[in-house]
Structure formats: C-alpha cells, structure tokens
Amino acid sequence: MNYLIHQLLNTEEINLIKKELEKYPQDWEDGKKTAGSHASMVKNNLQLNRNSEASKKNSQLVNKKILSNQSIKSFSLPKRIHGIMFTKSSENMHYGRHIDNPYMSSGRSDLSFTLSLTNKEFYEGGELIIETMNSEEKFRLNGGEIIIYPSSYLHSVSEVVNGERLVCVGWIESYVKSTAVSYTHLTLPTTEAV
C-alpha cells in the first residue's frame, strides 16, 4: 500500500482553524449533499458548507500549506488541490466503504487526503480504513497530521463511538496522470512514506 503520513499543521494553526469553524454552527450540513450516488447511501457525517466564509478562508490556508510542503510535493507532484471541505463525525456517525470519483467538477482526483484537526485521544472509533486487493490498514491520526493515498483505493471511516472527529479532506490532481505511472511514482523512496 502506498501512502504518505506527514505533520502538516502545528498546534497553533489547528487551534486557529477550529476557532473559526466553531464560530458558524449554522453552516454545518448533511454530508450526503456532496456525495456521489453510491457514497450518499453510506455517508453519515456533517460537513461545512463550502460557500461559507469559514470554509473559503480555511480551505485557502490548507491549500497553501500543502503546496508549500516539500515532502508532499515530492510525493504527490501536485498540479492542483481541489474539493477541500471540512467534515465532522460525532457519536454513531460513519462513512461506509466507497471509492472517490476519479473526475469531479473541481478537477481530476488522482490522490485523496485527510487532514486531522482532532487529536486521537479525544475520540474513540472513527478510524480511516484503506483497502487494496492485498491489504487493509486502519489509521487514527494525531492533530495536524495528513495522510495522502491514491483515490482509487477503497476506503471508509468506522463509526465514532465517543467524542468528535474533525477533519479536512480534499483531492490532488497530480502532474502524473496515468494510474499505472502514478503507482510507479508512489513507490519511489520518500523520507515520509510509511
């Protein structure tokens, strides 16, 4: 399995984002609104309205941080970051098994990312589960950590048992277009790959 886990945000940056998001409770809506036909049947979470000021402002911050990070640039060869949104899952919420759409209105999705805005000790459950033909791995990230993986991987988020899981998700259109070539590139050594 090919993926990158990297510390993208520090504690101060996380707290600034969370403070902004907490200002606008009315802007959180049913996550099914942006899901594809299959994903909408298995998606049970909340997401921040992409047109809200809090979403626009903090999406720009995340976009800038990703594009300026050398480890991420070396791993993903990003042409464009798109579809950024903030989601949260509280008790009993989850996101069933699905594959991200390869083409979205905002761009091509070669790589998917999840950026954690909550330290893992503040919630139970809520593991990101990534599957390939040969393996399945579960991830619970620390606050500020980002995981990047091929959008073609089957993945899900297990039910949150306690607490609240707050993340930022989005997609990367890479300069490496072909799936086969992308996989070849992703197997090249990178200091942050695990």
Residue ranges, per PLM feature:
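Signature of the catalytic double-stranded beta-helix
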Residues: 20, 35-105
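Catalytic core of non-heme Fe(II) oxygenases with the double-stranded beta-helix
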Residues: 71-180
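Short amphipathic
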Residues: 3-9
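Conserved small/polar residues in nucleotide/adenosyl-binding loops
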Residues: 184-190
